[in-house]
Design a protein with these regions (language model features):
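Alpha-helical transmembrane segments of multi-pass small-molecule/ion transporters
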Residues: 1-311
Length: 311
């Protein structure tokens, strides 16, 4: 196993250990449903917005505006492609109302924040992280607009007519807008404010993973298996989406570094924030938990294989 592959594998193991801690806390009755919901709201309203804005203010160097805009647009193309594929697949699977939104979320949104950044660093070095941060901006915006719509419409058992503007006007969305404006204006490397936000944002990853593990503690082992729709969604997240993006984006992206980072970020397992959104909107939490568990486990193999195939 080479250094890059070992670094990727190590990040996956770290993720599982934290999820396992949350699982153990639930089994030991150290966490409750009220705790899970409260911690989820804290992450979505406070620590995640702090992490997003802090990622820009802590940067010592930003690419030029042209590069920022180009990288941002490439990432938007990737997400537009994944959203279109998810809509088609859930229609072909005849996913029922009340569940189709969660399946769409699982197909489109990967765990970019926790796994994506360390994996990118392990493969291309820390200098590549600024591009990963730029690619993460569309993720944060779309995850809490389109992704929130997917899950909220599931919970309400209706279409988009039941989802109001408040679904999209959240602290996370506002922080994404602030981060994009700061990056375009070239405002960065603000030590005091950046450090404060970074310290607060550092709570996001362990807190989110503890919620995932605690929620898994509500499921019996036999309930983790899932059905055919779940497995199709997992395969789409780990295999179909990165391969499709590799083929399509290679037609418009000339820089192999940018292309590689884009493809690898689309190969991450299901985003753990899906669990918190389901908690917030009282949606189908068990399905997204199963998807998070299985895609994280299987990504121990799929991500290293993808990196090797891409060369």
């Amino acid at each position: 196993m080479n250094t890059d592959t070992l670094g990727i594998f190590t990040q996956m193991v770290v993720l599982f250990l934290i999820i396992g801690t949350g699982y153990g806390c639930k089994k030991a009755h150290l966490t409750t449903a009220a705790f899970d919901k409260g911690l989820s709201n804290l992450v979505l309203s406070v620590t995640l917005p702090a992490m997003i804005v802090g990622s820009v203010l802590n940067s010592t160097q930003l690419p030029g505006r042209t590069d920022i805009v180009a990288a941002f647009l490439y990432s938007c193309v990737a997400y537009a492609l994944m959203i279109a594929v998810a809509l088609v697949l859930t229609a072909l699977m005849r996913a029922p109302i009340g569940r189709r939104g969660v399946l769409r979320f699982m197909m489109v949104f990967g765990n970019v924040g926790f796994l994506g950044f360390p994996v990118i660093s392990a493969i291309w070095g820390s200098d590549a992280l600024i591009y990963a941060a730029i690619f993460n901006l569309p993720f944060n915006f779309l995850c809490f607009t389109v992704g929130a719509w997917f899950i909220a419409s599931d919970a309400q058992g209706q279409g988009m007519e039941k989802v109001t503007w408040r679904t999209f006007c959240t602290p996370t969305i506002l922080s994404c807008c602030v981060a994009i404006v700061l990056a375009l204006l070239g405002i960065h490397n603000v030590p005091v404010i950046g450090s404060a936000l970074d310290t607060l944002g550092a709570m996001t990853t362990p807190a989110a993973l503890l919620v995932v593990g605690s929620q898994l503690g509500n499921l019996a082992p036999r309930e983790l298996v899932g059905d055919a729709r779940l497995w199709v969604s997992c395969a789409a997240r780990l295999v179909l989406m990165p391969l499709l993006n590799w083929v399509v984006l290679s037609l418009i992206v000339d820089d192999p570094l940018i292309l590689g980072i884009l493809v690898v970020t689309t190969a991450m397992p299901v985003a753990n924030v899906g669990t918190m959104l389901c908690q917030k909107y009282d949606a189908d939490t068990p399905t997204v938990l199963r998807g998070t568990f299985w895609t994280t486990l299987l990504s121990l193999v799929t991500i290293p294989v993808l990196v090797l195939v891409m060369g």
